[in-house]
Amino acid sequence: MDAIKINLDDYELFGGGANGESFNHKTDPTVMLKLYRPGIVQQPLDEITLARKVYEMGISTPEPGDYVTTGDGRYGIRFRRITGKKSYSRATGDEPEKVGQFAREFAGMCLQLHATHVDTTQFENVKERYFRLLGENPFFDAVQKAKLERFIADVPDEDTAIHGDLQYSNAIFVGNERYFIDLGDFCWGNHLFDLGMVYLCCNLSNADFIEETFHMPKSLAIKFWEFFAREYFGPGIPLKEIEELILPFAGLKTLIVERDTKRPMPELRVGLESILS
């Protein structure tokens, strides 16, 4: 797929994250741009390819537009702009008294996503993705990798959708319309792999990161998780039992974080203690 060259002067910055920045078009209110940081080339191409497939499946996500590049060699994607939207992380930070409402709405989106059956010939299996990430990771030794491979292999298979980067900043809403965004890691498999990211973002990440990335204090993020977990799993399962189930899957997200940061993340590996001990 060839990238369309754009002039970044036509866009206005409105936000950013670990991998890139978001822009609105200055004169066309229906267009937004997600631009990756310099040197990130394959991820935007993978994301738009997947985004088109996911959109065609009927999963609620903004309609993807074009694969683009800037004059200085950065790559990104143009999407249909959802005017007036907010992410669930931003909304929670802005209105902390509504944390329960926002967490329950996000949980409802996740339940619907994880009930969606996928044509498994069209997308990657989450286990294969983790096996690949583990093989590429230079920060685990051979014994640790063998234990992690065994854990991943033993997880029961499911043929349902996985977002792949299920942060509460990657779900947006406006009015009664709700959308998932940032679907570059979309795949299929056991839903627990997805829920690990929710737990990591609310509980394992350090307070400064949560404040900067998700616009709220860590204490509020933990409350978000507690409301989310009760809505997702139902009232019959104690929170401690849910967290014991999810913690190793949150720890596995270390493989993604270490891929992106190119350094070991011991503060996140605590989630892997039950596997590696």
Language-model features: locations:
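An alpha-helical support segment within catalytic cores of ATP-dependent transferases
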Residues: 1-2, 115-164, 168-169, 174
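Active-site activation/catalytic loop segments of kinase-like enzymes and analogous catalytic loops
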Residues: 195-235, 249-264
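Conserved N-terminal boundary motif of the eukaryotic protein kinase catalytic domain
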Residues: 5-13
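Hydrophobic "anchor" residues on beta-strands that sit immediately upstream
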Residues: 30, 76, 159-161, 178-181, ...
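Regulatory N- and C-terminal appendages and interdomain linkers associated
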Residues: 1-4, 260-277
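ATP-binding pocket architecture of kinase catalytic cores
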Residues: 12-120, 156
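Catalytic activation segment of kinase domains across protein kinase-like and atypical kinase folds
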Residues: 171-195
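Short, glycine/acidic-enriched loop or turn micro-motifs at the edges of active sites
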Residues: 83, 166-168, 185, 197
